[in-house]
């Protein structure tokens, strides 16, 4: 691991490249450009940037209209506001007609920290995953966030991409894998337990696997960056190989990655199964590291939970 960079920062940098090479891409924000990092586009290419103020629903409806004219709108706001305030518009104005709009939501999960439970969205993956035809992505690091941003610009259809406020380690060497929509990446092979993780929890899962190795437990770690459509073939293969499955997400254990993996395995693979995430609770204010620990989402806590459930 090397530098720590937030996935939202990589997203902002990728947008600069996109608008410079693709004249169809436009960037929309709802008065949070400095936080979502779309400010980079606003400064470098103001003709490509639209600030709608605190009006997320209007922003999404406008993006839907833009898409009918052949543009590729990237809408940015906090996950709480995308999944909360603009949900009807995302469902009915974007997904229902299957318009080519990208909803890129930052500040997701409890790692938002001091902003508190009102802003720590732990329901967004579930809400977006249930919308018919919606592709749902949660990058693990800055490199993957940039690659995903570039990839979804070329993908025709509605996309929800979940991004983080917190700066986290950028993968290096063998950990850097190609980003292909709908294809999981195996970051560590193992035979005793398969850990399926997404977003910031991928790095924590790798650290947890190191802890498990000290006790002779050989854990595989698989990065599920595309939660929908999930890589069912990969999930099935590793569940069958290990016979024990753990899912890890900085999201409610209801409706997110854990349920997506369970849907694949149910009735097909006989294995032990346990979900690690936020257990039917709201978040709370505090430093990101402290809040993650409060919800059992640090590597040492995860290792202990995994040992107790395999």
Predicted regions and their residues:
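Thiamine diphosphate
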Residues: 1-162, 167, 178, ...
């Amino acid at each position: 691991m090397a530098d720590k960079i937030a996935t939202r920062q990589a997203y902002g940098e990728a947008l600069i490249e996109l608008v410079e090479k693709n004249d169809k891409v436009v960037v929309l924000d709802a008065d949070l450009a400095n936080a979502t990092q779309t400010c980079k586009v606003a400064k470098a290419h103001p003709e490509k940037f639209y600030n709608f103020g605190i009006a997320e629903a209007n922003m999404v409806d406008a993006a839907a209209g833009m898409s009918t004219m052949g543009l590729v709108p990237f809408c940015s706001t906090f996950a709480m506001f995308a999944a909360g305030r603009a949900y009807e518009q995302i469902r009915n104005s974007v997904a229902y007609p299957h318009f080519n709009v990208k909803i890129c939501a930052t500040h997701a999960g409890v790692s938002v920290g001091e902003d508190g439970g009102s802003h720590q969205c732990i329901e967004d993956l579930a809400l977006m995953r249930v919308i018919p035809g919606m592709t749902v992505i949660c990058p693990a690091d800055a490199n993957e966030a940039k690659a995903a941003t570039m990839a979804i610009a070329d993908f025709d259809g509605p996309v929800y991409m979940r991004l983080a406020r917190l700066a986290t380690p950028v993968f290096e060497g063998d950990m850097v894998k190609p980003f292909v929509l709908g294809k999981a990446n195996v970051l560590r092979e193992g035979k005793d337990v398969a850990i399926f993780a997404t977003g910031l929890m991928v790095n924590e899962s790798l650290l947890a696997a190191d802890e498990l190795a000290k006790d002779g437990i050989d854990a595989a770690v698989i990065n599920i960056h595309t939660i929908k459509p999930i890589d069912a073939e990969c999930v099935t293969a590793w569940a069958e190989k290990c016979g024990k499955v753990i899912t890890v997400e900085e999201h409610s254990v209801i409706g997110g990655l854990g349920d997506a993996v369970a849907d694949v395995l149910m009735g097909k693979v006989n294995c032990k199964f346990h979900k690690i995430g936020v257990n039917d609770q709201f978040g709370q204010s505090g430093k990101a590291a402290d809040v993650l620990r409060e919800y059992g989402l640090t590597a040492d806590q995860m290792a202990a939970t995994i040992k107790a459930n395999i």
